[in-house]
C-alpha cells in the first residue's frame, strides 16, 4: 500500500468487491472526527500528489496543509535515524501553526506511530492502512460492491494478435 493511492481506479475496474485507498480512507475518516486536519508525510516530493488527492476526494475544505517531515520511509524502521522525532516535531507544528484538530499520517510506514502520537497530543491521529481495512470491512458487511455501471465497469476482452495470440485467456 502507498498513501498516494496509485492504481486505485484501475483496481476498481478489475474487481467487484470494494476497493479503498489508504489516503482516501484516512482523509474521509479525519473529516468525520474533526473539522480540520493536516497530513504529515515523508518527503516533500510527495506533497503535490497528496494535495491533488485532497482535491480529488473533495477534502480541500477540511485539509489545512500537507506537510513533509523529510524522513525517507525506510528511516522509519531505523531507531537511530531520528525519523520518529522529525515526524513528531512536524505533527506539533501542524497542530500549532495549521491549527488542525486531527493529523493524518501520510505514509503506510507510519502505521505504528498513530496511537502514541494520538496519546501524546490528545488529538485523533489517523493511519490510512487501518482506516482502509476497517472501511472495506464495513462495506463488505453492508453488502456493498463497486458499481460496474460506466466508470468502474470491467474492461472489455481484447483479442490478442501476432506473437501473443497463443496467450489469449480462455473464457
Per-segment meaning from a language model:
Residues 95-102, 106-125, 137-150, 158-171:
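Extended, histidine- and acidic-residue-enriched regions that form the cofactor-binding/catalytic faces
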Residues 31-69, 82-83, 138-171:
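Short, glycine-/small-residue-rich phosphate/pyrophosphate-handling segment
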Residues 51-108, 113:
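Active-site rim beta-loop-alpha module in soluble metabolic enzymes
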Residues 1-14, 107-111:
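Beta-alpha junction/loop-to-helix N-cap segments that form part of ligand/metal-binding clefts
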Residues 43-46, 68-73, 109, 130-133:
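Glycine-rich beta-alpha junction loops
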Residues 8-10, 49-51, 113-116:
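Short glycine-/acidic-enriched loop or helix-start segments at secondary-structure transitions
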Residues 11-34, 116-135:
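Short, acidic/small-residue loops that bind anionic groups at enzyme active sites
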Amino acid at each position: 500500500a502507498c498513501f498516494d493511492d496509485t492504481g486505485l481506479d484501475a483496481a476498481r475496474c478489475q474487481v467487484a468487491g470494494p476497493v479503498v485507498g489508504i489516503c482516501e480512507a484516512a482523509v474521509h475518516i479525519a473529516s468525520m472526527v474533526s473539522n480540520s486536519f493536516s497530513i504529515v508525510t515523508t518527503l516533500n516530493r510527495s506533497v503535490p500528489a497528496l494535495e491533488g488527492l485532497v482535491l480529488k476526494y473533495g477534502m480541500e475544505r477540511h485539509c489545512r496543509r500537507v506537510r513533509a517531515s523529510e524522513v525517507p520511509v525506510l528511516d522509519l524502521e531505523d531507531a537511530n535515524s531520528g525519523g520518529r522525532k522529525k515526524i513528531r516535531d512536524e505533527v506539533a507544528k501542524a497542530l500549532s501553526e495549521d491549527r488542525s484538530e486531527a493529523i493524518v499520517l501520510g505514509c503506510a510506514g507510519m502505521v505504528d506511530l498513530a496511537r502514541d502520537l494520538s496519546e501524546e497530543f490528545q488529538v485523533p491521529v489517523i493511519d490510512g492502512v487501518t482506516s482502509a481495512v476497517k472501511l472495506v470491512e464495513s462495506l463488505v458487511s453492508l453488502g456493498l460492491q463497486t458499481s460496474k455501471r460506466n466508470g468502474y465497469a470491467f474492461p472489455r476482452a481484447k483479442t490478442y494478435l501476432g506473437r501473443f495470440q497463443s496467450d489469449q485467456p480462455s473464457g
